[in-house]
């Protein structure tokens, strides 16, 4: 029973011990790292195929359609068929393109997202590397994808691709600021930049109830979630590849597997940012009986992450796309000030000489108050703008 309660860790220990019986220590360590990397890659690819299927089913349900239902049971293998189709497509390079940057960009888009997965704590004992600067590591590697998409747009020798690349810089860098500020609020509460440490800091509190940050700083979670939508380039922030404006955006000239790399990066990014939201705000692998049976942690983590992903897909089928001026104004005039207010509140409250429970109650009430005030101001501005348009139309 003890073996089953922490199944994956115990299998790893058994395999490591078995190899140590006839191999030198350096080769055992090398095999451990290589095998761990392979398991991570295979796991994320399977997760991406499943997430693509979930998106198609959720959106089709919202649009009163059936969705994929031909390839495999319930259409589960439709994404596999799409990959096989892309493998047969011709790889083309446009005339006048800067070939080195053009061919390097698809790889640079994918690899940073895979590297970030190494610091995500999937359960209590399953993590690639528990860095004490995990949050800083995520922020640093996350910026590489911005440069890669700009490389793709600039090197394609296409005006629509270049315009999409410019939008990458404007949108992703703008929304990265409030997202990082929201994560810093969680870091201040947890007192660590380790992703595993942030999860452990959300464990058993008053009456053994979890201290999930979504219930402590709900406004911080809202800022992070909206910013993450923009970082994923998801509706209503999909201006980087708006079909009606700039055709396919920065990867318009890519075909075959080069295009598939961008497609893969988009879905890995969706899984990754949802996993980060789970880690920082939803308690990560924390859940009932996880201390007695750590193997449950990976299922709790997967369920929470899937819940966030489904909500993202629901938004895709519900909201229209922003205009570029609305998108930029919302980032700098709304999200950045709100993120700074949350960060300031956390910095002040954690220094108060009161119990953690009282601190969290103060933070929750103040977050709700700021959120209601912000909604009131936004509603007033919207009414004023609508009235001006109405009067202008009469004139």
Where do the protein language model's features map onto the residues?
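Selective transmembrane helix interface/packing segments
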Residues: 1-395
